[in-house]
A protein has these predicted regions:
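Active-site helix of classical SDR
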Residues: 129, 166, 174
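Alpha-helical segment proximal to the catalytic Tyr-Lys
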Residues: 134, 179-183
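Active-site loop-to-helix junction immediately N-terminal to the catalytic Tyr of the SDR YXXXK motif
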Residues: 109, 156-164, 176, 204
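Residue(s) in the substrate-gating loop at a strand-loop-helix junction
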Residues: 149
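Substrate-binding pocket helix/loop in short-chain dehydrogenase/reductase
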Residues: 105-106, 110-118, 216, 220
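Conserved glycine-rich Rossmann-like NAD(P)H-binding loop of the short-chain dehydrogenase/reductase
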Residues: 37-52
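Conserved glycine-rich cofactor-binding loop
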Residues: 16, 23-24
Length: 228
């Protein structure tokens, strides 16, 4: 596939960003774009692969460090913020990307399935925002980007009750938090992407009717414009 060459214009020169769920998929795509635009990024995810991804970006001349973090744990999020402040001194951007999606029939599902989605998709965003926002408030500046889903805002498929519920919650969370943070010159925005070529989507694509026939380009978008 032909790859377009995109030119960086340094939109984020000197900015310090935390990206959760940064080891793969949309989070990794955001990390590539942010660092290409000059940001220094702290990549957070649960597994060691986030450390390897940080090494990959460093090898390409980007400013990136990895940190293992479980966003469902409030203390882990505080540790992430402490690490960022110790490493870079401040936080300008917070990208809340970490999330899970597993399919299950609502009537036969157990509470563990529901609670897992709530723990990562809702509490995870809540925890990392609670940990990072005090720094932005002190700075009287900042930007929070929350990755929800079209599933939580427009349309959902069978088996996605837990996922759709938690992603819809993020839309309401964003609206309310944006109003609270506006007096501190902090922007809070929510993005609701559709299907993207990520490991998460590929894992459950086989259990759904294909969506690509309904798309103008007959293919799923890539998580990073450099891959398009």
């Amino acid at each position: 596939m032909h790859q377009r060459e995109l030119v960086s214009i340094g939109k984020l020169d000197g900015k310090i960003a935390i990206i959760t769920g940064a080891s793969k998929g949309i989070g990794a795509g955001i990390a590539r774009v942010f660092t290409e635009e000059g940001a220094c990024v702290v990549l957070a995810a649960r597994g060691n692969d986030v450390l390897q991804f940080a090494d990959e970006l460093q090898a390409a001349g980007r400013e990136a460090v990895g940190f293992r973090c479980n966003v469902s744990d409030a203390q882990s999020c505080k540790n992430l913020v402490d690490f960022t402040l110790k490493t870079y001194g401040t936080i300008d951007i917070l990208d809340c990307n970490a999330g899970i999606c597993t399919l299950s029939d609502f009537l036969t599902s157990d509470d563990a399935w529901r609670d897992a989605h709530i723990g990562i998709n809702i509490k995870g965003v809540w925890n990392v925002c609670r940990a990072a926002l005090p720094t932005m408030v002190r700075n009287n500046a900042g930007s929070v980007v929350i990755i929800s889903s079209v599933t939580g805002d427009m349309v959902a498929d069978p088996g996605e009750v837990a996922y759709a519920t938690t992603k819809a919650a993020l839309v309401g969370f964003t609206k309310a938090l944006a109003r609270e943070m506006a007096p501190h010159s902090i922007r809070v925005n929510c993005i609701c992407p559709g299907d993207v070529q990520t490991p998460l989507v590929k894992a459950w694509q086989a259990n759904r009717a294909p969506t690509t026939p309904h798309m103008p380009f007959r293919r799923l978008p890539m998580p990073c414009p450099w891959d398009a």
